[in-house]
């Protein structure tokens, strides 16, 4: 049985989030949560929340052993980019891209 959680329009860079997501994929839920809890960057906190949501979704299914769940897949897609401008010297301006991410976590029952 699989469980899924999706977080859209998260204000974290998709590139940096994928670096953290690669470390979590294939781990047991408890081990993945401990890893994310003590990883000192913003994407880890966002992924931790999505993982908790997927775990809560799994517990609602019924007949599922939540402790035996494994992180089957973590998909990080790029969301829309917010464009901002920063004033610079001599009347110029520089474009700043604030990137967003769509994060999907899929849990499955099974062995690590």
From Swiss-Prot:
Keywords carried by this UniProt record: Ribonucleoprotein, Ribosomal protein, RNA-binding, rRNA-binding
The keyword Ribosomal protein is assigned to this record: yes
Coiled-coil annotated residue ranges, if any: none
Gene Ontology CC, one term: cytosolic large ribosomal subunit
UniProt KW RNA-binding keyword: yes
Signal peptide stretch: none
InterPro entries for the chain: Ribosomal_uL22, Ribosomal_uL22_bac/chlpt-type, Ribosomal_uL22_bac/org-type, Ribosomal_uL22_CS, Ribosomal_uL22_sf
Subunit architecture: Part of the 50S ribosomal subunit.
Annotated function: This protein binds specifically to 23S rRNA; its binding is stimulated by other ribosomal proteins, e.g. L4, L17, and L20. It is important during the early stages of 50S assembly. It makes multiple contacts with different domains of the 23S rRNA in the assembled 50S subunit and ribosome. The globular domain of the protein is located near the polypeptide exit tunnel on the outside of the subunit, while an extended beta-hairpin is found that lines the wall of the exit tunnel in the center of the 70S ribosome.
Family assignment from sequence similarity: Belongs to the universal ribosomal protein uL22 family.
Protein name as it appears in the record: Large ribosomal subunit protein uL22
Organism, as annotated: Desulfovibrio desulfuricans (strain ATCC 27774 / DSM 6949 / MB)
């Amino acid at each position: 049985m699989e469980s899924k959680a999706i977080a859209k329009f998260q204000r974290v860079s998709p590139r940096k989030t994928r670096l953290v997501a690669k470390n979590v994929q294939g781990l047991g839920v408890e081990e993945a949560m401990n890893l994310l809890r003590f990883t000192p960057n913003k994407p880890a906190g966002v992924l931790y929340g999505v993982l908790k949501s997927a775990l809560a979704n799994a517990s609602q299914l019924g007949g599922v052993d939540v402790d035996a769940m494994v992180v089957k897949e973590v998909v990080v897609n790029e969301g829309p980019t917010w464009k901002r401008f920063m004033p610079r010297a001599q009347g110029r301006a520089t474009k700043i891209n604030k990137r967003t991410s769509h994060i999907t976590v899929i849990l499955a029952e099974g062995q690590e």
